[in-house]
Curated annotation (Swiss-Prot):
Protein name (database record): Superoxide dismutase [Mn]
Subunit structure: Homodimer.
Cofactor: Mn(2+)
Catalytic reactions on record: 2 superoxide + 2 H(+) = H2O2 + O2
Listed InterPro entries: Fe/Mn_Superoxide_Dismutase, Mn/Fe_SOD, Mn/Fe_SOD_BS, Mn/Fe_SOD_C, Mn/Fe_SOD_N, Mn/Fe_SOD_N_sf, SOD_C_sf
Listed PANTHER family: SUPEROXIDE DISMUTASE 2, SUPEROXIDE DISMUTASE [MN], MITOCHONDRIAL
Protein origin, superkingdom: Bacteria
EC numbers: 1.15.1.1
Entry note: cofactor: Binds 1 Mn(2+) ion per subunit.
Alphabetical list of Pfam families matching this protein: Sod_Fe_C, Sod_Fe_N
Length: 206
């Protein structure tokens, strides 16, 4: 089986578009260096997987799995992350409406209560990881989840990621230093709730 190479997705905005919440320097490094690096490593792991499959090398197949999980998860998470953001004045920070808002209010009482829960849970991630607004299509339930390192939410929990925030230090340290909470408190003003609501509508039909 031959795998196609993955490529770095283009951002739907300029590197400086999310300022002052996320600096252009961070966005460029995060996208061009970190995300591209994960993709390069993923493609190398897939090449090795090809060889291992062709030779039926079970030990090599097992050894490749951590690299696939880490770098594949990184690519999934970051590809979603870029789409979940929007500049202020161009949709960023405009609260959700319609059915998603109703469901958020059902589970948290208010949109503000949800944001507090999301920020607090994401800030509490030990080391590196992600904070998520997750959706379970089978139960039509929302919940806040966190994942360690670059674990992809759906592959590890079965939940659908609607909103994610990267709490790896490379996502904020150049600008916020060790003040992760300051980064997270600023983050809601660049969330693209239109994209997330459309994703919710699509996923709720599954």
């Amino acid at each position: 089986m031959v795998f196609s190479s993955y490529m770095l997705p283009a951002l739907p905005y300029d590197y400086d578009a999310l300022e002052p919440v996320i600096s252009a320097e961070i966005m460029q490094l995060h996208h061009q260096k970190h995300h591209q690096g994960y993709i390069n490593n993923l493609n190398e792991a897939l090449k090795s997987l090809d060889v291992a499959n062709a030779t039926q090398d079970l030990a090599r197949l097992i050894a490749i799995n951590p690299a696939l999980r880490f770098n594949g998860g990184s690519h999934i998470n970051h590809s979603l992350f870029w789409e979940m953001l929007a500049p202020q004045g161009k949709g960023g920070g405009v609260p959700p409406r319609h059915e998603l808002l109703k469901l958020i209010e059902k589970f948290w009482g208010s949109f503000d209560n949800f944001l507090k829960n999301f920020i607090t849970s994401s800030a509490a991630v030990q080391g590196s990881g992600w904070g998520w607004l997750a959706f379970c299509p089978q139960k039509q339930e929302l919940m806040v989840q966190t994942t360690a390192n670059q674990d992809p939410l759906e592959a590890t929990t079965g939940m659908i990621p609607l909103l994610g925030v990267d709490v790896w230090e490379h996502a904020y340290y150049l600008q916020y230093k060790n003040a992760r909470m300051d980064y997270l408190k600023s983050f809601p003003s660049i969330i693209n709730w239109d994209y997330i609501e459309n994703r919710f509508v699509e996923m709720s039909k599954q």
